[in-house]
Structures are given as C-alpha cells and as structure tokens.
Amino acid sequence: MWQIIFLTFGWDLVLASAYSNFRKSVDSTGRRQYQVQNGPCSYTFLLPETDSCRSSSSPYMSNAVQRDAPLDYDDSVQRLQVLENILENNTQWLMKLENYIQDNMKKEMVEIQQNVVQNQTAVMIEIGTSLLNQTAAQTRKLTDVEAQVLNQTTRLELQLLQHSISTNKLEKQILDQTSEINKLQNKNSFLEQKVLDMEGKHSEQLQSMKEQKDELQVLVSKQSSVIDELEKKLVTATVNNSLLQKQQHDLMETVNSLLTMMSSPNSKSSVAIRKEEQTTFRDCAEIFKSGLTTSGIYTLTFPNSTEEIKAYCDMDVGGGGWTVIQHREDGSVDFQRTWKEYKEGFGSPLGEYWLGNEFVSQLTGQHRYVLKIQLKDWEGNEAHSLYDHFYLAGEESNYRIHLTGLTGTAGKISSISQPGSDFSTKDSDNDKCICKCSQMLSGGWWFDACGPSNLNGQYYPQKQNTNKFNGIKWYYWKGSGYSLKATTMMIRPADF
C-alpha cells in the first residue's frame, strides 16, 4: 500500500518537474521553439505554424482581450466567440504537441520515468522506513507513557483507596471515641451523683462518729478515773502486803528473841522497845531500806510536805533503791506535752511516764543524788550512762539540769549538753536556738541549742526508726538519726 502511494506521488513529481522545465520561445526566423529541461539534459523542439486557425473578421479580434473600454452586448458576444476559437486552436496545438512529445520522447520518458520512479521509490521507501521507525518509536514512547500514566493512575488510585480506608477508620475511631466520651460523661454524672450521695452519708456518719467519740471520751474518762482508783488500791494493797510481810518478819524475830531469852536463865527479863515504824517515804531508797525490796509502784511524799506522788521503784538493777523519773518502751504515751504537765508529771508508772520536774527538783535539792540512764536499741543492744552528781534547779530557773562525773557504756562524752541547760516544752521555749527545738524535735527536754539528745522525742517503731531527726536519740551512742526502742532515767542517793 505504501509502495503504491509512493509510486503515484513520484509520478506526479516527474510530471510537475517536466512541466516546470517546459519553456516556449521564438527563433530568429520567426518559428516557435519549445525547450524542455530535465536534469542536465535539455531538449528543443521546432514546431510548424498552425494554418488551421480562423482569420479574424473583426477589427477587434487581435486585441479583444486587452481592451479596457466598455463594449456593448454584441461586441461581447463576438469577443467570446473569438476567444473560444483561440482556445480551440490552442487546444488542438497542445494536443499535437502532446502527440509529438509522446512519439519522440516516449522511450526517453519511459527511461526517465523508470529512473525517477526507482529513485523516488527508494527515497520514498527510505522515508517510509524512517517514518515507520519514527512511528514505531513514537508508538513505543506512547506505550511507555501510557504505561507510566497507567502506573501513576493505579498508584494514585491505591493511595486514594488507602486514604479512603484511613479516613473511614478515623471516622470510625472518632465515632467510637465520641461514644466513649458520651459513656464517660454519663458515668461521670452517675459517679458525681454517687459522690454527692456518699458525701451526704459520710457527713451523717461523721456526725454519728463525733457523737460516739464524745460518748467514748466520757466513757474513757470514767474508766480512767476507775483505773486510777484501782491503781491506788493496788498500790495500797502492795504497800500493805509489804508492811504485813515486814511485820510478820519482825514478829518472827521477836518471837525467836523471846524464846531465846526464856530459854536462858541468866538473861535479863527485859523486852526491847521498838521504834515506831516509818510509814512515809521520801524516795525508793528509803523504801528499799525499810525492807520492801520488790519492784513496783509506791507512794512517795514530797520533802517537807504531806503531798504524795506515785512512782515506780526498781529494786533489782544495781542493788535496787532506784526512783524511776522517766520511762519509754512502746510509744503508748504522747510526750509532746505542756510545761505544766512536765512539771506535775503524766503517764502511768506501770508503763510510760514522766515523774514530774517539781518533785525531782525538790528531792535532788536536799541531798546528793546519782542519775542512771539505761538505753536499748532495736537490735537487742543495751548501754547506760551514770552521772555521780545530778540535780535540777527550781522552776524559777526553768528546771536547769546539772550533771558531773560521767561513766558508762553509752558514750565517753555526755549527750546532755553541759554546763546545765534549761528545760523547754512546746509552750515554753527556753533553749538557745531561735528555731524552737521543742516544736521541731518534739517533746520536752534540756535542748540547749537542739543538742545531741532527746529521750522524750517522737516514738518510731522498728524499721521506721532510722533517719529520724525528731526521734528518741542519744547521739554519742547511736547517732542523731537513730530512734531508740526503750529508755529509763532513775535516781538514788549517792550514799546508798
């Protein structure tokens, strides 16, 4: 198909080339010449004059076409006839020329046509091949572009699908979260209502508990008074029992003495008159010397007074006769007390208690006393400090402590600051620090400037007793952050 098209196109080019190289001229003799140029070859034809042309009968025939003046209708018809005759003559002449050319130039034209056709065919084939190659290349490029566009379109469709899926998921999550928020709001409203109801019930319960607490406090007060009475009766019974034992012992000695005297004929019949037995005691040493050697609670009398106070007497440690002025063992008693309470004493002699600064001051102001401090830690170790001279000044001197002559195993340096320090409580600050040691360290003590000891500090149980600045401490034995398990402070006369 392409070859036929190229062949036809080549033949048209040959004819066009032939007619384009066709020239007409007149020689010197007046004869007409026709020259044909085909490539490097040139062909000249001499043609005879045509004698069959019609003669013009009108004066306007020769130049009828070139006239510019207006003519009437008859002149126009004549002119058209003349033109038709001329056109017919020219047509005949051309036909003759064509026949002549065909006869004379047939062979050459055939060869020329063949050469031209071959050349043009080769060129056309080459052009066609090039066009085919270019078309194929363009087709491949178009195919590649289509593939790329298809891939890009597919990728975009996948991304769009993924975005659509993600959007659907997000919308679902938003719906779920909105639903959860609504549920939480409903639950929150329910809980708020429940909290309000619980607050109301709690207020009622608190009011009821307050009333019960008041009733329990009244009951505890009554029971405390009953317990105090029972303790008094127990102490009285103990003292009476001890006195009965002593009287029985004295009676047995008297009976034995009488029996001895009666069995001896040379003995004088006289009976010794015994002194009146002492029934009041200044301290536990006097009780011990009276023959009462059992540790327990006894009644002591203030010096130069009939006022009495209960104290625990230790008749076992170091020969006995010790009056216990302080004891800590389980944290059952709060030692963060006022000045008045430390002055008069508090707690129970059977457990944790403070005997009272006023009694100790009056007692140690009349005779020379020694002070022994016993300490226990949470690991089962024990230590003590013994001062061979101890006394407290009066209230006007803030019960200032005086100590000398330290011995013992609880440190070679006294953990109670010397010279004497004033006593301080939470409501009476007499220390040498602007920080109020009693409020910061807890309890009443001879703090000096929040010094190295405080046996009346906060009680801490085991495993909670380390790194406690406000605990029961004795610096020169266990350090400042160790809170002890038990402490006892006791005194007796130096000449016991």
From Swiss-Prot:
Glycans are attached at residues 89, 119, 133, 151, 240, 304. The keyword NAD does not apply. Residues 275-495 form the Fibrinogen C-terminal domain. It is found in: Secreted. It comes from the Eukaryota. Keywords: Angiogenesis, Calcium, Coiled coil, Developmental protein, Differentiation, Disulfide bond, Glycoprotein, Metal-binding, Secreted, Signal. InterPro entries: FIB_ANG-like, Fibrinogen-like_C, Fibrinogen_a/b/g_C_1, Fibrinogen_a/b/g_C_dom, Fibrinogen_CS. Expressed in the ovary, uterus and placenta. Residues 1-18 form the signal peptide. GO terms for molecular function: metal ion binding; receptor antagonist activity; receptor ligand activity; receptor tyrosine kinase binding; vascular endothelial growth factor receptor binding. Residues 159-256 form a coiled coil. One of its GO terms (biological process) is angiogenesis. One of its GO terms (cellular component) is cell projection. Interacts with TEK/TIE2, competing for the same binding site as ANGPT1. Interacts with ITGA5. Interacts with SVEP1/polydom. Interacts with THBD; this interaction significantly inhibits the generation of activated PC and TAFIa/CPB2 by the thrombin/thrombomodulin complex. PANTHER family: FIBRINOGEN ALPHA CHAIN. Binds to TEK/TIE2, competing for the ANGPT1 binding site, and modulating ANGPT1 signaling. Can induce tyrosine phosphorylation of TEK/TIE2 in the absence of ANGPT1. In the absence of angiogenic inducers, such as VEGF, ANGPT2-mediated loosening of cell-matrix contacts may induce endothelial cell apoptosis with consequent vascular regression. In concert with VEGF, it may facilitate endothelial cell migration and proliferation, thus serving as a permissive angiogenic signal. Involved in the regulation of lymphangiogenesis. This is Angiopoietin-2. It comes from Mus musculus. The lineage of its organism: Eukaryota, Metazoa, Chordata, Craniata, Vertebrata.
